[in-house]
């Protein structure tokens, strides 16, 4: 083999080796460039991230500062509200205490007022009772004086049988039988206007006379319950010495029927004073006239005229209260 050929064969591996080295160098340069680029990118990313973090930190710091201020302000407001709430609670407690005090005072005043009203009512009731008793006593005294005067006149020969027109005489008393719808008190006023009073009945004979002449539908009479002692008293102040109650009567002590009517049968029945009846009976003492001189019998009253034998009638027995 020739020498030239041997040199070419030897040169061939050397060329290949140089070509590989060049490729390795180029690869290293490319790799270095890539790493440099990557590092640059990392540095840029780090710088950008650092800036962002700084901005976030600054923003967070500002937010924290603002939040702290807000918290401080809120805490101050909260403390002020708490103080105000405490003050309001104290004022509310004071108001409640004042309300309770006023309530106690109001209750005490109510008790005192009720006591005063009860005392006033008791005083008025007592005064009314005393006034009624005094009025009844005065009326009874007047009645007694009138009866005594009549007894004296009768003993002196006076004739006591004169009655006003439309009045009927019976045993030295005059009776008026009124007609018209009235309550008990208005019937009493009607009798007062005629200088009389609602009738008081003291004997069976008087009761028979009234039963004969009174209305058959019922009439008011002068008996009533004043609620002083739970007993009935005549309007002239006299007590009940004769009674003619219907069976089961009276019932006013429990039902408030404080006035008395006379039924058509003559029996008595207690009734509500505001009940309206169509009749009532008044009475008054008859007027006495002096005795007529002998021979003037015509001037004497009808009960004083001589009988067919020429004798004067015996005077009626005196009335007793």
Swiss-Prot record:
N- and O-glycosylated. Ca(2+) binds at residues 249, 251, 269-270. Gene3D superfamilies: Mannose-Binding Protein A, subunit A. The lineage of its organism: Eukaryota, Metazoa, Chordata, Craniata, Vertebrata. GO terms for cellular component: external side of plasma membrane; extracellular exosome; plasma membrane. This is Low affinity immunoglobulin epsilon Fc receptor. InterPro entries: C-type_lectin-like, C-type_lectin-like/link_sf, C-type_lectin/snaclec_domain, C-type_lectin_CS, CD209-like_CTLD, CTDL_fold. SMART domains: CLECT. Residues 1-21 are cytoplasmic. Keywords: Calcium, Cell membrane, Disulfide bond, Glycoprotein, IgE-binding protein, Lectin, Lipoprotein, Membrane, Metal-binding, Palmitate, Proteoglycan, Receptor, Repeat, Secreted, Signal-anchor, Transmembrane, Transmembrane helix. Disulfide bonds join 160-288, 163-174, 191-282, 259-273. It comes from Homo sapiens. There are two kinds of Fc receptors for IgE, which differ in both structure and function: high affinity receptors on basophils and mast cells and low affinity receptors on lymphocytes and monocytes. It is found in: Cell membrane; Secreted. PROSITE patterns: C_TYPE_LECTIN_1, C_TYPE_LECTIN_2. GO terms for molecular function: carbohydrate binding; IgE binding; integrin binding; low-affinity IgE receptor activity; metal ion binding; pattern recognition receptor activity; protease binding. It is a single-pass type II membrane protein; Lipid-anchor. Sequence repeats lie at residues 69-89, 90-110, 111-131. SUPFAM superfamilies: C-type lectin-like. Glycans are attached at residues 63, 296. Residues 48-321 are extracellular. Homotrimer. Interacts (via C-type lectin domain) with IGHE (via CH3 region); this interaction regulates IgE homeostasis. Interacts (via the C-terminus) with CR2/CD21 (via Sushi domain 1 and 2). GO terms for biological process: B cell antigen processing and presentation; defense response to bacterium; Fc receptor-mediated immune complex endocytosis; Fc-gamma receptor signaling pathway involved in phagocytosis; immune response; macrophage activation; positive regulation of gene expression; positive regulation of humoral immune response mediated by circulating immunoglobulin. A lipid is attached at residues 17-18 (S-palmitoyl cysteine). Detected in urine (at protein level). The record marks 149-150 as: Cleavage.
């Amino acid at each position: 083999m020739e020498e030239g050929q041997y040199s070419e064969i030897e040169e061939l591996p050397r060329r290949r080796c140089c070509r590989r080295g060049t490729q390795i160098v180029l690869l290293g340069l490319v790799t270095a460039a890539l790493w440099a680029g990557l590092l640059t990118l990392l540095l840029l990313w780090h710088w950008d991230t650092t800036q962002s973090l700084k901005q976030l930190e600054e923003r967070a710091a500002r937010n924290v500062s603002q939040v702290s201020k807000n918290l401080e302000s809120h805490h101050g407001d909260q403390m002020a509200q708490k103080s105000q709430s405490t003050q309001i609670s104290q004022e509310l407690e004071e108001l409640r205490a004042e309300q309770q005090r006023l309530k106690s005072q109001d209750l005490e005043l109510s008790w005192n007022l009720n006591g005063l009203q009860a005392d006033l009512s008791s005083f008025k009731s007592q005064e009314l009772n005393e006034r009624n008793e005094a009025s009844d006593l005065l009326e009874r005294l007047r009645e007694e004086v009138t009866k005594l005067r009549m007894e004296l006149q009768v003993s002196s020969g006076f004739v006591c049988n004169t009655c006003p027109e439309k009045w009927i005489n019976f045993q030295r008393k005059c009776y008026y039988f009124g007609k018209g719808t009235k309550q008990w008190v208005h019937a009493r006023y009607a009798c007062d206007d005629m200088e009389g009073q609602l009738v008081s009945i003291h004997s069976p004979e008087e009761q028979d006379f009234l039963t004969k002449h009174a209305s058959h539908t019922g009439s008011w009479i002068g008996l009533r319950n004043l609620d002083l002692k739970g007993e009935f008293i005549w309007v002239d102040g006299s007590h009940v010495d004769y009674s003619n109650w219907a069976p089961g009567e009276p019932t006013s002590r429990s039902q408030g029927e404080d006035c008395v009517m006379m039924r058509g049968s003559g029996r008595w029945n207690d009734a509500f004073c505001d009940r309206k009846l169509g009749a009532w009976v008044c009475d008054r003492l008859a007027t006495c006239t002096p005795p007529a001189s002998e021979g003037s019998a015509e001037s004497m009253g009808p009960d004083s005229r001589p009988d067919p034998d020429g004798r004067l009638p015996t005077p009626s027995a005196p009335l007793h209260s």
